[in-house]
Amino acid sequence: MTIMLQIYCKNNNLTKDFPEGSTLLDIYNGFNLEMPYGPVSAKVNNKVEGLNFKVYYNKDIEFLDITNPSGMRTYFRSLCFILVKAVEELYPQGSISLEHPVSKGYYCTLHLDRSIGLDDVTRIKQKMQEIITDNIPFQRIECHTEQAVELFTQRGMMDKAKLLKTSGQLYTFYYRLGDTIDYYYGSLVPSTGYIKLFDIVKYYDGLLLRIPNRKNPQKLEELVKQEKMLEVFQEYHRWNQILGISTVGDFNIACNNGHATDLINVSEALQEKKIAHIADEITHRNQNGERVKLVLISGPSSSGKTTFSKRLSIQLMTNGLKPYPISLDDYFVNREDTPLDENGEHDFESLYALDLPFFEAQLKELLDGKEIELPRFNFTTGKRENSGKKLRIDENMILILEGIHALNPALTPNIPAANKYKIYVSALTTISLDNHNYIPTTDNRLLRRIIRDYRYRNYSAEATISRWESVRAGEDKWIFPYQEYADAMFNSALLFELAVLKDYAEPILRKVPNNCPAYSEAHRLLRFLAYFVSVQDNELPPTSLLREFLGGSSFRY
């Protein structure tokens, strides 16, 4: 007797019966859905699964295409596996590493015993297209973790063997594509034919893997030159290689061998050295006739701008200057006056969430030598208040303006460029899960924000996750276009950071109920954090950038 299951489809708000053991693809076809770009994965009771996932109980299902962030991740992972297989077939003695996002694509390093040329790129792209045309199925294989570790070790894929060996999981899964095996953090599409659009081009010394635009999947993401960003990533990759820590498996082994404190101390010292170098650059400009009046510090949400500005101020003071940090957040309009986005929700990332006329008037008064009273924004009440702090600047004083819009030319249009020093701060995660699974920098920042919002702003993880897509859209519009204008870029991510955030984030994420849309993201983040060993924060210095989110800072916020 066939057991029938009741399946509710969120895409069309219909319920239908299906045989037990039906795949998600069977269910999609059974509902006769017509998604413009086709499904690539689905949320099953708010957990993302691949389309070959079999259903054995009544479920709520929502099918996802590549316009959805989770769907795009599935598409991208599948494309990566195709790239890995193409390189394996073309260069049996070579390999490829997927390193980090840059220029609206993903930077890859092709490891050969020679430099790569345009003909290599052409061959790889042609081979990838052949693999896609052949519509080869992706096979998901579940096994005991020890078996997977042994298999990857035999294949010389030690990055994956180390990751799985230190993950603490009894069982794991890996994927097979023809004769090629690999491990991916998350689901893949059923077969290579699901990949419709991609490109791969030569980019400096490596390759750039390009993907469709999520809002318009019939077009590739526009290629944006980000030379400074690439330089920062590559510098930190070189530093990680010197330390022998390029992947999470390397990191976990080092911590298990008692080196966590060393990694904390070295990472913190490197950041302090970078901050001191930036302070020296500003001082050098002042000594060479360029009067820097404003240091503008921008960066996306939870990049650590505030603590960076305070630490930079200390370094400037050691150089004989008198910095005064001012947070642009204190110039927010009252919450009820915040502009609305296209969905009718408050757009806190908009430039016009700031009271620009008031800010410009106060800045002019300061630069004219007048005294002002600084405002303070109360995030609890959503109102701007008088702080009681008075400020007048003198010849040796530098204003440190920190906020997401600091690099936007519209913020300080009347200040000559020679009087401004611009700094872009972001958490550019340079460690990877393994050679084919990079860690999104947005995950790093989202975890910071979840912890900070919960501890200091009385927001649940559900609320923070629900707003994150809007935050990201605001960053794309208001922040990222100006990052290459910076005179200096500072990477606020710390090598050990995610292992420290883990113990703070996990209990907050577990509070997200499984019947809400944010649960799928909370579940994904919990699975991600499970790859890291825990590192306690007792060795963190009180001036650490992480203290801005965790507490225990010697700075006042």
Regions found by a protein language model. Name each.
Residues 295-297:
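Hydrophobic anchor at the beta1->P-loop junction of P-loop NTPases
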Residues 359-418, 468-482:
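Glycine-rich phosphate-binding loop used to anchor ATP phosphates in small-molecule kinases
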Residues 53-72, 95-273, 278, 283-288:
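Auxiliary tRNA-acceptor-end handling modules of aminoacyl-tRNA synthetases
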Residues 286, 413-557:
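Conserved NTP phosphate-binding and transfer environment spanning the P-loop NTPase/kinase superfamily
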Residues 305:
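Conserved lysine of the Walker
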Residues 2-104, 113-114, 126-127, 229:
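Ubiquitin-like/PB1-type beta-grasp interaction modules and other compact soluble beta-rich domains
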Residues 324, 333, 337-380:
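Conserved nucleotide-sensing/catalytic segment adjacent to the nucleotide-binding pocket
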Residues 308, 312:
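Hydrophobic positions on the alpha1 helix immediately C-terminal to the Walker A/P-loop
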